[in-house]
C-alpha cells in the first residue's frame, strides 16, 4: 500500500505486544511484566519506558505515516546492552525497531506489529578519531552537527548533510545524502566499517573488528549491505566514517534563470564541463518564494540555483569563471555572492529550511516530500514535465533538489482531510515515480523505501531482485523481527518459527 493510502486508511488496535506469536502471551499480564522485568535487568529502571507519551514519540518520524507506537521503548547505553536486549526480544519473538533521532521521511520507525523500540540516543560517544588517517568512529547517538562541532579545531569535517540534524548511524541506515553529495558522495561512499547487532543479539563487524582501510577487495561488501537497510537487517551501533580536510576557501552564489529548462540545462552543462562544484541546488519559483517569505529574504522569484565552490583561491577562480560563462549563456543572472561564513550559513539555512518554508505556504496542512533521482541528462525533461503535472493538477508542490546528482524533491503540502486532494496527490506521486523509472532512474534517491515505496521497489528492481533481498533478510533475520514491514512487505515468518 502506498503512502497516501496509508495516510487515509491506516488504523491499528493498540493492544500490548501484538506481534505475531507474542499474541499468545500478550493477554497474560504476568508474562508481559516478565519481559519488561528482563529489559530492566539489563538497562535499569531508567532504561525502559512503557509510558504512552514516550511510546507515541518513538512511533513516528517526520513522515505522514501514522501507524501504532511500540509497546516498550528501551534506552541502551552500550553495544553490550543492545545485544542483551536483542537476545530477549529474539527469545520472545518481539519485533525490534531501531530509533535514532526520528528525522526520517518514509515511516521507518512505525511499529506495524508493536514490539520494542531501541532508542539509541544515550549512545553518543565519538569513540575514535584518527586525524592523520581522516576517519572517525561514532556511536548511534552522535549527529552530524555534533560531530562537526567536535571536529571544529582539527581542520577536518564530515560533509554529508541531509538537512535535518540526523544521527550518523541513522544516516547510514537510510543511505542518506544531501547538498554536498555531488562533490563528496552519499553515506554509501563514506562508511568504512559498521558494528551491527543482529536480530539474535550477535555482534557483527562488517569489515572486521577495528578495521578502517580506505579501500578493500576482501570478500563480500557487508558494509554496503547494511548501508541503506533501514533497520531491517540489524541495529547499527557504531559507524566508522571518512573525514575530509576543511577546504582552504569556500564561496557560495545565487543565480536566477528565466525558466526551469535554462536552470537545469546549466546544471547539466556545469557537470559535463568537469567543474568540481561542491553544491548545486535547484529551487523553482514557488520554492524560492516560500524561502523568501519564511527566511525574510529577497531573491528573485524565478527558477534559481544555489551554488558553492570549494578549493584554493586559484582553483575556485577557474571554477567560477567556467560556471559563470555557462549560466550566462543560458540566460542566468549575475551571481549574488555569499563569501563570509555568516552569509553562506544564512543562504544554506534557507535551503535546508525548505521543508518548513513549504509547510508555511498552507498552515495547518501536512507535508510530504517526493524523492526521485534520474541520470543527469534526463533531468531537464523530468523537472519540466513534473512542474507541468503539478500545475495542471492544482497541487502545491514547490520543487527543490540536489540536481548535481539528478535528485530532486517536490515538497507537497496537502490537507489530509480533503479526500479529493489526497487522491490527486497520490496519483501524482505514482506518476512521478514511474516517470523517473521510465527514464532509467529510481523512486528514491536518499529517503529510502520505508512503508510507502515497497510496491515501487518491486517495479524498480524486479521480482528476482526482491526474492534475493528476501533471502538475505531470511538469512540474517529468520524470524523477521528487525523492523518488519519496512522495505519488504510483511511476512508471517515470525509467527511460524
Curated annotation (Swiss-Prot):
It catalyses: (R)-lactate + 2 Fe(III)-[cytochrome c] = 2 Fe(II)-[cytochrome c] + pyruvate + 2 H(+). Keywords: FAD, Flavoprotein, Mitochondrion, Oxidoreductase, Transit peptide. One of its GO terms (cellular component) is mitochondrion. Residues 65-246 form the FAD-binding PCMH-type domain. Disruption phenotype: At 3 dpf, mutant embryos show no visible abnormalities compared to wild-type embryos. They do not display any ocular abnormalities at 5 dpf. They nevertheless exhibit elevated levels of D-lactate, but not L-lactate compared to wild-type larvae. Its EC number is 1.1.2.4. It is found in: Mitochondrion. Signal peptide: none annotated. Its main location: mitochondrion. GO terms for biological process: lactate catabolic process. Transmembrane segments: none annotated. GO terms for molecular function: D-lactate dehydrogenase (cytochrome) activity; D-lactate dehydrogenase activity; FAD binding; flavin adenine dinucleotide binding. It is an enzyme of class 1 (oxidoreductase). Its cofactor is FAD. Disulfide bonds: none annotated. PANTHER family: D-LACTATE DEHYDROGENASE, D-LACTATE DEHYDROGENASE, MITOCHONDRIAL-RELATED. Belongs to the FAD-binding oxidoreductase/transferase type 4 family. Involved in D-lactate, but not L-lactate catabolic process. This is Probable D-lactate dehydrogenase, mitochondrial. It comes from Danio rerio.
